[in-house]
Amino acid sequence: MKTFFCNRTVDKGEMKRLIKWVLLNYGTEKTTRLIDKLKTMGFHYATHAGISLGIDDLSIPPIKSAFLLNAENDIYENDLRLKRGQITSVQRLEKALDIWNTTNDTLKTEVVKYFRSTDIFNPVYMMAFSGARGNISQVRQLVGMRGLMADPQGQILDFPIRRNFREGLTVTEYMISCYGARKGLVDTALRTASSGYLTRRLVDVAQSVIIQQVDCQTTQGLRIVPELEKIESQLIGRVLFEDVVDLETGRMVGYKNQDISPALALKLIKQPALTIRSPLTCRFHAVCQLCYGWNLAQQKLVQLGEAVGVLAAQSIGEPGTQLTMRTFHTGGVFAGEATEKVYSPHNGIVFYSKQARGRKIVSKYGEVAFLTFEPLKVKIKNDNTTSVLEFPSFTLLYIPPGQTVGEHQSLAELSRIENKQNFQQFEVGTENVQKEFMSNCSGQIFLPQRQNALINEDNAGTTTFNYSEMWLLAGKILDSKTLVPGDQIKNALYPIRSKINCEPSRLTTTLPLGYVFPIDSNQTSLSKLQSTDAETLKQLPLLQFSKLSADNLKFARSYALELNKTLFHCDSLSKYRFITSDLEHLPFKSKNLFFNQDTPTKKVPTFKIKFSRFGKADKFNAKEKFLLLRSVTKLVSTQTNPLKTQFANNLFVQNSINKNKKTFLEVVKPLKTFQKKTNFFPSPTHENIKSFNPSLQNGNLMSVDADYVRLNVQYGKGFSSLLNCGEVRATNCMMTEKDQIAFKSPVCDLKMKVGDYARVEDQLTTSTRIPLSGQINFITAENVLFRSVQPYLLVPGSNVVVKHGSLVQENSVLGTLMTSQSTAGDIVQGLPKVDELLEAREPQHKVLTSMHAKLSTLFSQYGKIYGLREGCELSFQKIRQFLVQEVQDVYQSQGVYIGDKHVEIIVRQMTTHVVVVDAGKTGLLPGDIVDIRRIEQLEHTGFFAGVKYRPMLLGITRAALMAESFISAASFQETKRVLSKAALEGQIDWLTGLKENVILGRLIPAGTGLY
């Protein structure tokens, strides 16, 4: 062997290349000896060097503290913009995650630089970068910062772990990192099992694919566009389908049936398109030598008898353990790589041309930035240093000219847009998501009147806004129920100007034994009610009625109730209070209590009650937003006309407002109580439900004699029974001392007047900034009195469920924000994705097109143009290429590279079956699944003439069970079914695959056994 001198660092990649080169040039024996010598030398020097980790080897780059300080400043600026109402809470969270993710990535780069510049023989550096043990991500956690963690639900927390393992974690950081650590261990265990099962299915589906002949004489090839990045998986080791001529020189570059070496591949890369041979286009039942190409391990044509199916299955299954198991849910930055940011090299003032071509845009985080349309030079100048930075086109500049920047401050973001045409499609790959936003204090809503701000208002009282804002004026919500004229008010030290807003509370009372359920529009109605036990009687607190307008109230405090009899009736309007009584009743299935004792005004909780045993529930749209489930009660009116009362609809519409403004010491008179009741079903009950009571049959008026209905009797289908609104209280909003800020300021210099709204950090005077957002309430000679205010930004498409002037408590839902998040965020990644593709499952998200639907569409198009057989073949070819590309994308995104031919062999096994539509005069039946190659063979004999079929995509499990060998299929899954079917049909197993021969103890038809 010649002596070669090679002066370079031999890491894992270099070692691979060296061994591969020796193997190809000098054969197996000499390579084995070389590897043995390398091993001995490696161990010898490892013991001399002492490559074991000590605590001193974990050196932290000094620049870390500067990076963290900058990140903290960015976070502070981000939070300030939220307080000023310039961004939404969703944008604040996404920006915070982006800041920490970018800081972490930049710090990782700095760690590598620091090691390289200070100590390249550092054990940590040598281990990680030689590929011997560990990786860059683990090094980052040892000496950089641990970074962002996920909570148990998989959501990324915006509280990062700033420390590393060298510094040690705080208790809080340790608890946060526990989620991820345990998840990682569970993931690894699950991944091993899933990967093993995937390999088993792949081997079972492809075990019969063996190289049996040299050439299949195919008339079809696979058309590809060569790409330099994919040269290894795409070209090297393939066979050319036709001669290739250089378009510029006219010289022959490659010949038909020539295998492509690495040298030839570099020449072919210049061709606009190539046609190569592929297992997808092979005419044989297995695969021929030329369609398969090289055995990639030996870099020469595959030998006859090679079990390439098993090889392909192992090549795809083995890297399965390296794939991620989790479903990413990150909303952008974590699903892909972090955007590349540019930082200021030192502090100074930024200078660049104001005439630069570009436009101002708002980034997805709500920041105003300048997008350049051409390359731009930016100067950063201070007393000592001047730096010039050159930015390419389509860079986002966050700093305007003339502004001062600090060292390591974020200046710009390099965009992935390459030209102006792509600018329009900048937001491709995002979807709109609605997220709720809450009030952070109690108070009154103020919606500024803006032209074109309001887009529409629907029946439910939901208002949709364009870009606009909303202000929440802080104040304490007081209930005026206890105030009567003459009462003294403790600590009534409130400004005279403060307004008191009154609105009817959302108190609702029900008819006797009624239960109120707040519901959303179009939610499934609770239309059926069941008594759980027809015999057992239990106790329940009942409603005590007090007289309002009638004398003849018929009500006994305590007596037993007979089944199916009226409990009581009254002919007056009533208000109620809970009492505990000895009355007995039939218990309901739901065990929930709907009201707290003696607190009838408390907001009624919403309960989910499932009556799924009783069939399909109905949808209904209730304007009143309340569904009343109640025992049927008799109401007797002495008047000749039915009970008619004026009914104020807005009392029952969710979020309804009564905008009466009164001073605080006036007592608000309670509104009258109203009652309305319709005594018929608006729609007939289901036909198949019969009642023991003839008055409850389909379409009849509702009887009021039955108190409870028996099992399987429908209680009512969307009945309109409106609520008895008892004593309605007024609610007042008043400003307390903690809701106002007073500070001294020279009034002559004021830039604002009484009633103006100001945001935090706004300029009040030339020397004073406002510490909190607020509304100017009062100005004296020395002081300015502010009312605390929280501004909210309403982005386009936001829904607001509160009205102007309405009162809200702390942590109330104000509406939903429309926000866009990356669609890559929620796509299943890694092993589950490979599994979904190879099993040809229907996608869970309806946005994604089903492969089965795609195949059907392609066949209907091609079938009309090219006929049955050609159309079937062409639609199969398209779907095969799509599947190969999708599987490869998943593996390549995780840094795993597999030869295309391995995936093609598996995909080919999935796409070789058709479903018989019209059997003609053959012995087949419509719906039979047949191998298309069998039909093609029999069509030549004329036996299969007239048969009609359509292509079918089978997942690998079904394809393995549909195998020609019933012995192979029975040993895989569903043994009884497969053997019973084979016995009934009298199938013959020709023992062509490996598995069936192994089971029977025969010589396998591979290797020398082929002959």
Swiss-Prot record:
Protein name: DNA-directed RNA polymerase subunit beta''
UniProt KW Phosphoprotein keyword: no
Subcellular location: Plastid, Chloroplast
Family of the protein in this entry: Belongs to the RNA polymerase beta' chain family. RpoC2 subfamily.
A Gene Ontology cellular-component term: DNA-directed RNA polymerase complex
Top-rank lineage group of the source organism: Eukaryota
Chain ranges passing through the membrane: none
InterPro entries linked: DNA-dir_RpoC2_beta_pp, DNA-dir_RpoC_beta_prime, RNA_pol_Rpb1_3, RNA_pol_Rpb1_3_sf, RNA_pol_Rpb1_4, RNA_pol_Rpb1_5, Rpb1_funnel_sf
Cofactor(s) it depends on: Zn(2+)
Gene3D superfamilies the UniProt entry points to: 1.10.132.30, 1.10.150.390, 1.10.1790.20, RNA polymerase Rpb1, domain 3
Function, as annotated: DNA-dependent RNA polymerase catalyzes the transcription of DNA into RNA using the four ribonucleoside triphosphates as substrates.
Species, as recorded: Ostreococcus tauri
Entry EC no(s): 2.7.7.6
Catalytic activity as recorded in UniProt: RNA(n) + a ribonucleoside 5'-triphosphate = RNA(n+1) + diphosphate
UniProt keyword terms in alphabetical order: Chloroplast, DNA-directed RNA polymerase, Metal-binding, Nucleotidyltransferase, Plastid, Transcription, Transferase, Zinc
GO biological process: DNA-templated transcription
GN (gene name): rpoC2
Subunit structure: In plastids the minimal PEP RNA polymerase catalytic core is composed of four subunits: alpha, beta, beta', and beta''. When a (nuclear-encoded) sigma factor is associated with the core the holoenzyme is formed, which can initiate transcription.
Binding site for Zn(2+): 216, 282, 288, 291
Catalytic EC class: transferase
HAMAP family registered for this protein in UniProt: RNApol_bact_RpoC2
Cofactor note: Binds 1 Zn(2+) ion per subunit.
One function term, GO molecular function aspect: DNA binding
